Amino acid sequence: MSLSRRLTLCAAAAAATALSLPAWAQTKTKVAAIYTVPVEQQWVSRIDKALKAAVARGEIEYVFSENVANADYERVMRGYAEKGHTLIVGESFAVEAAARKVAKDYPKVSFVMGSSGKPQEPNFAVFDNYIQEPAYLSGMIAGGMTKSNKIGMVGGYPIPEVNRLMHAFMEGAKETNPKVKFSISFIGSWFDPPKAKEAAFAMIDKGADVMYAERFGVSDAAKEKGKLAIGNVINTQDKYPDTVVASALWNMEPTVDRALKAVKDGKFKAEDYGPYSMMKYKGSELSPLGTFEKKVPADLAKKVKDKEKAILDGKFTVKVNDAEPKSTL
């Protein structure tokens, strides 16, 4: 795959502000990120957004590489470490051994990697999008909005990070609609909108009237067929105002900001940042209903709001199930 590298710079206003600061305040952490997909892909776009927010605050210098093939990942990691970047962020799901090897070879560099594994001392921290809570809430909406009692779900790969979101969504849907059934498919890619769209079309043709858009392309199919969709990670309702009812949103800022502070304070350590994606840390949330504010029945909206409060109050815990979900249709 092609490799492109971009340098993200502060806006002119931010730069002007930085010039007025004392020298000690202008010391910036050098951060590099490595993405195996285009930066606009929903999952990595949330990491990029959080890092760019730190750029805008004048805290970091940030560069990234996108579309990095798995075979090139180790080389790119080493390149950034050699160039003096003190924090490297990425996704090591398919390159765990190689990524951890690089971390061992550069003990003075801090690594924060999306991973299915555990932290590795002393400098390899891990994270994940623990957004099963808003996924459950979005499932409640889907269960209450389907008229055919059939929901289609299209995912990338059946790995724990995807499976737990699908299971949470399904449990939420069953809470508001015990009769609901699910059609589930994985496309074997993190970024193949045409393939996801075709998988969604197949489910819609079999009666699904609400689609769970774990991947890009699903909402396009729902829009073309006049069906509804539930988004994942980002809110795309602005692009699909009559299609996307709600989305389970991932906010990477709590994770990124915690890691940056640890690096700046010289206290970075190998830890699991996954929990900072949960609602109580503002790492995730259910999107506003927006264009569907008056289309979602009031009693359904109240049930969702009450459940959201129960989660935040610690009175309800969304079960984490990492097993591969199966179709019930």
Give residue ranges: language-model regions.
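Flexible loop/hinge segments that line or gate small-molecule binding clefts
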Residues: 104-129, 233-243
